[in-house]
Amino acid sequence: MNTADFDFDLPEELIAQTPLEKRDASRLLVVDKETGAFSDQHFDQIIDQLQPGDALVMNNTRVLPARLYGIKPETGGHVELLLLKNTQGDDWEVLAKPAKRLRVGAQISFGDGRLTATVIEELEHGGRIVRFSYEGIFLEVLESLGEMPLPPYIHEKLADRERYQTVYAKENGSAAAPTAGLHFTEELLEQIAAKGVKLVYLTLHVGLGTFRPVSVDSLDDHEMHSEFYSLSEEAAQTLRQVKANGGRVIAVGTTSIRTLETIGSKFQGQIQADSGWTNIFIKPGYNWKVVDAFSTNFHLPKSTLVMLVSAFAGRSLTLEAYEHAIAERYRFFSFGDAMFIK
């Protein structure tokens, strides 16, 4: 299949620039992949799609305020760093702008100078490994100096940075939010649990590759970026029990899907506690191992995320659902509306 097979025309005004005042006030397009039927609802009605004995699986990663603005003390030149992943100790892989003058040994100072970085390795495409020096606790320093790394298609300033976190965000490490989870409120999760649905958490730290366009014509030539994931023994046990009792595993978002399917693929369809790095690319023709239904936001044309949805619902039904969403003026991308596919 070709990348162009997953293209569609999206009016720019449908790209949501800010979150709605109330998280669960967003809209929900319910898609039945067996009948091909669509139903326009509001997100808080997702509870009607869940049955007692099901498991709702969410990604509890927390977005780091990973964009840092600094200067090179020797020249006064401005530098922007985007933290991608912690490689070891105080060493981080970053995306640097402008990168060409940041050679090994270059120093960068941030804020009042209580955070500094030294370039220790040069990577391709503007990537660098830097070693940070600071006083105190790194995450606290980052909270005070860093900015939220909002996606490139969002041009508005975010008034409250917590709105780019899920209410259950816990494990620091993402460069982007698992946006399907942004719609849930604590109250809605309490109602879902009270219905007899198991709430299960896993971790996948979202990398910037999530926004990277597919640059090859054939899907067979595309290589996914790697992201760190983790599923605890307690979570794995709950999911095994849900499956054994005939319940469904319902994933919130593509990051939860990719974690569960990575584990299912690794352990011959079994759900085991595991952690590691995944670069799984779920595209049409994929043989599903774990996930029975899922919620997700509306994604970019020609993205691997539209391909993932198509792998579950079929390409033509997925593109039909997107046409319906555009005609009905649904809001798209990170701060946009959601779909539930069963």
Curated annotation (Swiss-Prot):
Keywords: Cytoplasm, Queuosine biosynthesis, S-adenosyl-L-methionine, Transferase. It catalyses: 7-aminomethyl-7-carbaguanosine(34) in tRNA + S-adenosyl-L-methionine = epoxyqueuosine(34) in tRNA + adenine + L-methionine + 2 H(+). Gene3D superfamilies: QueA-like. It is an enzyme of class 2 (transferase). One of its GO terms (molecular function) is S-adenosylmethionine:tRNA ribosyltransferase-isomerase activity. One of its GO terms (biological process) is queuosine biosynthetic process. Pathway: tRNA modification; tRNA-queuosine biosynthesis. Its EC number is 2.4.99.17. GO terms for cellular component: cytoplasm. It is found in: Cytoplasm. Its main location: cytoplasm. PANTHER family: S-ADENOSYLMETHIONINE:TRNA RIBOSYLTRANSFERASE-ISOMERASE (PTHR30307:SF0). Monomer. Transfers and isomerizes the ribose moiety from AdoMet to the 7-aminomethyl group of 7-deazaguanine (preQ1-tRNA) to give epoxyqueuosine (oQ-tRNA). Belongs to the QueA family. HAMAP family: QueA. This is S-adenosylmethionine:tRNA ribosyltransferase-isomerase. It comes from Streptococcus sanguinis (strain SK36).
